Amino acid sequence: DGEQQSMLFSNEGKAIRCSETDARVMGRTAKGVRGMRVTLAAAQVEDDVETDTDSEDEESSDLNVASRIVSLVVVPETGEVLCASANGYGKRTPVDDFPTKKRGGKGVIAIKTSERNGELVGAVAIDVTKEVMLISDGGTLVRTRASEVARTGRNAQGVRLIRLGNEEILVGVVAVEAVEVEDDILDASIETTEETVVDE
């Protein structure tokens, strides 16, 4: 509607928040404009000839990697953003902690991409009524309440969201509506389980 803001997140833990009006309307075949300046691999540097201005609030991450955009989030009027890293750590941060900037900058730190955390896998807009689903490359799936994830500032490393096995990494995160299970349905489920155990 021309009045919303969006946030781009890179795998090196950076985020940039800007107005949708910063990206002009273009046709389907157009290349588009730079939303966020990412760290390029050595082979790509010579091809990067654009001259967009970097963000004044640019900060460095701990991991020295070629980066890519991993998430685009429409900024809610109120609420938070949950970031999840490859090694199963994450946190939720108020959207107000992210300053609005012009597009094309390097962004600010959204989560520390330390050796412990690994790269940023994804970010989602949440509030305390939502739940979060996390999945690993080994098929491990965890669903948890967003309110149970620690709420911290941008520069924090976060807490463990999912316990992973050796060489297993987190590959996806998504916010879902909370599902309330009525007590009578839960009791019936427990009774059925107990009967099954007795029969065995």
Where are these regions (language model features)?
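Short, structured "edge-of-domain" segments at secondary-structure transitions
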Residues: 1-200
